[in-house]
Design a protein with these regions (language model features):
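Short glycine/serine- and acidic-residue-enriched loop/turn motifs that recur at repeat junctions
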Residues: 27-47, 77-97, 135-155, 194-214, ...
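Residue-level signature of beta-propeller blades and closely related beta-rich strand-turn architectures
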Residues: 23, 32, 73, 82, ...
Length: 263
């Protein structure tokens, strides 16, 4: 018996905690009713349990009751709740052992992934070429494809003109919304963010409360270096957005019923 050591990253779902180890292994503990521990059962645990089937994991991201993992080969593994197809397996089956996400056409394994992010029940994938894929629950258009139909395989995120997003630098997701920071343009100018999805609390930095069906530009003359979307829910979802610029300044927007905005 001892402490969990050599942890390099952590993630948390609604009632489940995850730890990524230096050697690429993943451990889970807490609630496991959707099989999100990845050990082929649904038994809860009050101590860390080693996930099966995965190795060489370099990133983890937890949704409400599911986990995505990025491995060193650039493929994405998923486990747990999948009722909205958020694991990218072209089905809605609950998954108790990690499986690899499929390509955009649903055939073969997806590779070339740089970053992963998860909302409540949707997933966002940043590819090495700067394009963004999304999938899963889409009731508030958070998948960024222009409609609110759920998608069970990775689907190309499009901008306001219906063209594929190609200039993405980093991604963040939370609740029913998505942020995408953008690379500088050809002249070296900062381009701010794309925002997508649920905006009922004004959490998308667009100075309104309308949901965004496609990746919508939010201009900034500062480089965005970190982003996060938080949410809580009892009878309704409440969301707050946070970004950090190149000068280390923090900006918050959205729900502030408990002082979430820090102002």
């Amino acid at each position: 018996v001892g402490y969990l050591q050599n942890v390099v990253a952590i993630a948390a779902g609604e009632l489940t905690s995850f730890a990524l180890m230096e050697n690429g292994e993943v451990y889970s503990w807490g609630y496991n009713s959707y099989g999100q521990f990845g050990v082929n059962n649904t038994s809860a645990s009050n101590y860390p349990v080693k996930m099966k089937k995965v190795s060489n994991i370099i990133q983890i991201s937890a949704g409400e009751d599911f986990l995505l993992m990025l491995d060193a080969d650039g493929s994405v593994w998923g486990v747990g709740a999948n009722g909205d197809g958020q694991l990218g397996l072209n089905n809605t089956n609950e998954i108790h052992l990690p499986q690899q996400m499929l390509k955009e056409n649903g055939s073969g394994i997806l590779y070339g992934v740089k970053e992963i992010a998860t909302g409540r029940s949707h997933s966002v994938i940043l590819k090495e070429n700067g394009t963004v894929l999304s999938l899963g629950y889409n009731g508030y258009y958070q998948v960024g494809i222009g409609t609110n139909s759920a998608t069970y395989i990775p689907t190309q995120v499009v901008n306001e003109s219906g063209e594929a997003v190609t200039d993405a630098k980093h991604i963040a997701a939370g609740g029913d919304a998505t942020y995408i920071s953008r690379n500088k343009d050809s002249e070296g100018n900062n381009q701010g963010l794309y925002v997508i999805g649920r905006n009922s609390n004004g959490n998308l930095f667009t100075q309104d409360t309308g949901n965004k069906r496609r990746a919508t530009k939010v201009q900034s003359d500062k480089d965005i270096i970190a982003m996060a979307l938080t949410f809580n829910h009892d009878s309704t979802i409440r969301q707050t957005g946070v970004i950090v610029d190149q000068d280390g300044k923090v900006y918050t927007v959205g729900y502030n019923g408990n002082g979430e905005m820090g102002n």
